Amino acid sequence: MLSVEGVSFRYAGGEEPVLRELSISVPAGGIFGLLGPNGAGKTTLISILAGQLRAASGRVTVDGTPLEELRRREPASLGLVPQEFAFYPMLSCAENLRFFGSVQGVGGARLRERVAAVAAFARIESMLARRAGELSGGLRRRLNLAIGLLTEPRILLLDEPTVGVDPQSRSFLLDSIRALAGEGRTLLYTSHYMEEIEAICDRVAIIDAGRVLRDGALDELLRDEAAAVPVRHNNRSLEALFMHLTNRSLRD
């Protein structure tokens, strides 16, 4: 269980906090979705969980162990697939994978094995000799995913992993993420695309302005709101629920 309790954060010079005593509980295994518009605080929370930012207050634990302690003790246990492209465009795909693997403590024969394994999983084997900067948007997203999997993390943070890709690449990435959950990993998935959240997530937290508006199993959320949100469970139901809670669209 990944537990986020009362986490708040404000950027230096910012007038308003980005996260406001935000709490979620992510069960082990499966895919937990964070759904919210741009600026809701999704990326900030991911950055805190990844150790890139420090929360002003609150605590984060994994099975009762403080996240900072877990990162020190088991740095390979948590992986990150950021929204930005996390590689060097002038290096080849293979060079990027070897570099980031070594930075994360993977070396020797295991590094060679992991590079081959993640390249095969992301289906970029034929691209390993090409410079990362020459790849299409969809292939860059696949390389991003491959880098995040190098350490075989049991918890994977995915921040808008399908942004800017064509429908075919999006379908491949979503299928790949489902496969990872099938291997028993715990995935935290952020998006402002409600159709993606509905397609792959077991549980959902709808957030806005740094606060959790609703949190629960997808079917439970829709059933509980059925009286207030007169829509069927289709690809617009989560957006309708969000609009009911905030009086605005996810795309605002």
Regions found by a protein language model. Give the residues of each.
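Conserved ABC transporter NBD signature motif
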Residues: 58-69, 73-74
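Catalytic Walker B motif of ABC-type/P-loop ATPase nucleotide-binding domains
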Residues: 156-160
